[in-house]
Amino acid sequence: MSNGTDQAQPPPENPATPVDSKSRKRATPGDDNWLPPDWRTEIRVRTSGTKAGTVDKFYYEPITGRKFRSKNEVLYYLEHGTPKKKSVKTAENGDSHSEHSEGRGSARRQTKSNKKVTEPPPKPLNFDFLNVPEKVTWTGINGSEEAWLPFIGDYKIQESVSQDWDRVFTLVTSQNAGKTMF
């Protein structure tokens, strides 16, 4: 007959079970096989400050030279064609300005930042930078207007896809203004 003490005792500890540490996962040199070709990585060790010794890994896009700090940023860029926007943290009352920042900075700068918050975010690009068509033929229509229709073989490309291509072309050419592409 049991007096109930065997149920009140905690289970014995198992010293063979490893303890999970909360340390930050470090990237290994060979884990970049998810990166597209020609992308390069750079590993830097911080040499000063409170975070001295921390290893930072940067990813560089080959055409624009844009620097990314994380795999998530690179994947977002590859999927959308634009870098991830920094999130704007708001106070509990929904006001984007904290009490600490009131009265600081020029009125012009504050007006400009308020304007940015109210503008709708740009539509993300729906363009696959890794699987571009091999050959696209552009046919001009309505000679007086500058209207062009893209074709791949005999297949006419949808207007929405053509608009996405136009936005990507504008983005890439504006980023590379003054740089030699080839």
Curated annotation (Swiss-Prot):
Basic residues biased stretches: 106-115
Gene3D superfamilies membership: Methyl-cpg-binding Protein 2, Chain A (3.30.890.10)
Expressed in which tissues: Mostly expressed in flowers, and, to a lower extent, in seedlings, buds, stems and mature seeds, but barely in roots, exclusively in root meristem cells at tips (at protein level).
Ranges in a coiled coil: none
Composition skew (Basic and acidic residues), residue ranges: 92-105
Keyword Transcription regulation: yes
Keyword annotations: Chromosome, DNA-binding, Nucleus, Transcription, Transcription regulation
Name of the protein this chain belongs to: Methyl-CpG-binding domain-containing protein 5
Species this chain originates from: Arabidopsis thaliana (Mouse-ear cress)
Lineage of source species: Eukaryota, Viridiplantae, Streptophyta, Embryophyta, Tracheophyta
Gene assigned in the entry: MBD5
